Amino acid sequence: MNVYVDQSVRALAAAGHRVDVFTADPGGLDGTGSGRVGGTAGTDAEAGMSAQLQITDAITLHHLPVGATTKDELADAIDELAELLNDRPDFRAADFIWAHYWISAEAALRAHEKASGSTGTTGAALGNELQVRAPIAVSMHTIGAVKNRDSDTSHERPQRLEAEARIAAEADLLVAATPAERRDLITELQAESDSVVVARPGVDHSLYTPDSQSAARERLGFADDEAIILYVGRMQFIKGTDVAVDALAELHERNPHLASRTRGILLGAASGVGVEAGGGAVRPSSTYLRELTTAIAGEPSVEVRPPVPSHLLVDYYRAADVLIVPSRSESFGLVAAEAAASGLPAIASAVGGLPEIVEHGHSGLLIADHNPHHWATAIETLLNDTDLRTELAGHAADRAERFDWGRTVAAVLDALPERSCASSRRSEALGAC
């Protein structure tokens, strides 16, 4: 999500808009002055406890100093976030608010309520106060009900499920990354169809480009004769990290000769919570990661590495032979799009937005289930067929050209007037017509 906010903010600024970014990322609350504020404004500057940081002439980062140190604690601080937003003149003066993730969206809606003295829906009888209020667009990024459905669990907290239903009813515009997410917003959250716009995320094509595999491998310390299988993302059940590990283990058993020159790189870290399938007990993601690493303890060819910044990540894409994206739920799959732009074909789950990026048999391979046997077969197929990999890589890079951040923000901005004017009293009160 940080990449999405970073790049969409830059695209808005490039289109001539002034952008104020508000973040309550706990990374800025370590009290040392060295914590990054989430990367949401796309800077490597250390913002620490600063209340405001000028990123460019057009982009300002505002830090909201709540006492939360985890995502769950942040969800319990939504009223505090709403108060802090209302205290910021730049928030009150905004012409348009684009909230990312359910916590931010709920905070923005509550900020409107608090400013107007309303305790119910923001859509009715709010008087003249809302005449100066900006319309709210929301990108969910993930939907709690969809995560429960796709992982066959009931893990997502009721607070989130209730908030997302309310957000779908009250936001002026819902931004879906793909037609599949649009369907989910309508079927799972009962959003009105005319309130949802599809705006496909983009890729930073100035960074993610095909380049020499050999040079990238030299920079990363990989040998030219190795077969590199890459996984990039959080180590979570929902992301299918266990499928990646089990598939690599099966490849080792099935084809020891091929496995002897294959290295699996898992690039990521534990985040949030991991869950068992079928409504099993919730386990901390750190525990899930330990179980994964224990499972591969005797496999020197499989290596877990911490996340890296984008300027290093592109070298991993260029150095690898295949990306695997075994997610159980995925609203889009930005990793697959970045890899494609870098000339790396993916083997991906046929879920969510991934089929928008990976065209089966043309720019990569799609797997309909999470059976490690099928994933190992797909990996083996691509590693044994250099010509096929090369063909898929070329098509993947071509297909990735459709993902452009300028088009992303244009789709959102173009949808605002039509939606706001169609939104009866609320949007009229907002002055959107």
Regions found by a protein language model. Give the residues of each.
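Short alpha-helical donor nucleotide-sugar binding micro-motif in glycosyltransferases
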Residues: 307, 315-320
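Carbohydrate-associated surface elements
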Residues: 180, 202
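Nucleotide-activated donor-binding/catalytic signature segment of Leloir-type glycosyltransferases, i.e.
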Residues: 268, 277-308
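Aromatic "clamp/platform" in nucleotide-sugar-dependent glycosyltransferases that forms part
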Residues: 328
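Conserved donor-binding/catalytic core segment of Leloir-type glycosyltransferases
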Residues: 223-239, 245-249, 265
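Short hydrophobic beta-strand element within catalytic cores of glycosyltransferases
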Residues: 345-348, 358
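A conserved catalytic-core segment of Leloir-type glycosyltransferases
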Residues: 3-7, 11-96
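Conserved acidic donor-binding segment of nucleotide-sugar-dependent glycosyltransferases
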Residues: 307, 360-361, 365-372, 381-386
